[in-house]
Amino acid sequence: MRRDDGYDILNNNKLVANDIMPVVTLEVRMIFFKVILIAIWALGVPYLMGLLFREKCLKKDNLNAGHAIVTGYFLMFAVFYLLTMPLLLASASLSLLVILFASVCGLTSIISVILCRRRIKNHMRSGFTFFKNSSVIFWIAILIIILQTGVLTVYQHIDDDDAFFVATSTTAVETNTIVEIDPYTGEVLTAHRMRYVMSPFPVYTAVFSRLVMMHPTIVAHTVFPAVFIPLAFLVAYLLISNF
């Protein structure tokens, strides 16, 4: 179909569509790749680290994958804290912290796969059996947890302290520093705020965002709710199951 001036509308639309499709395909691939990264760092690495510690250090071989995941998060946070404190006080770069943290956790996970491969297979089989034999009440609870997680993940929620904590994470990523820039003013801090130095969760958000190649704000408002809400329920379930 042509306009009065001879412009071919149909052919032009085809050309536009052909130009857009590669871009859309690339974006879908990037989203899929980032989802895999999130699964690795939010689930795979904690599980493998916790499994290695429980089986080889604590010699507890009768516990399920949930115990390994929770233990792994304790270990990940401990490793992160021990790495962050000296680097922060030494005014090291965020990139160095990311490299060291990823190296320690990655190496530990690889060792876990090598030494605990039989236990991993057992956990896969026992997990399948557990979910297969779970009651209706259990699946209703899972559905409610998914709904709660989905609301906070998909819809917008505003936290008053985001002006500092998320801004601190974003500033760390953008300036490649560890709590050296005031997120309110953008000026270099003359002294460390010890309250936040001793509890560097905004720095963890920045490191995690680097590892999964996402903006810290998206990590804080979309990724972390999807991770930590189910994790909190998992901790509660493991505690209650002991009684």
Model-assigned labels for residue ranges:
Residues Y73-L75, A141, M194-R195:
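A short, ordered amphipathic alpha-helix with a cationic face
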Residues R2-D4, L152:
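Residue-level detector of alpha-helix boundary/anchor positions
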Residues I144-F243:
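Active-site lumenal/periplasmic loops and adjacent helix-entry segments of GT-C-fold
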Residues F130-V151:
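Internal/C-terminal transmembrane anchor helices
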Residues R2, L10-F128:
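Membrane-embedded, hydrophobic transmembrane alpha-helices
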Residues V24-T25, C57-L58, V136-A141, L211-M213:
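Short, flexible segments with low predicted structural confidence
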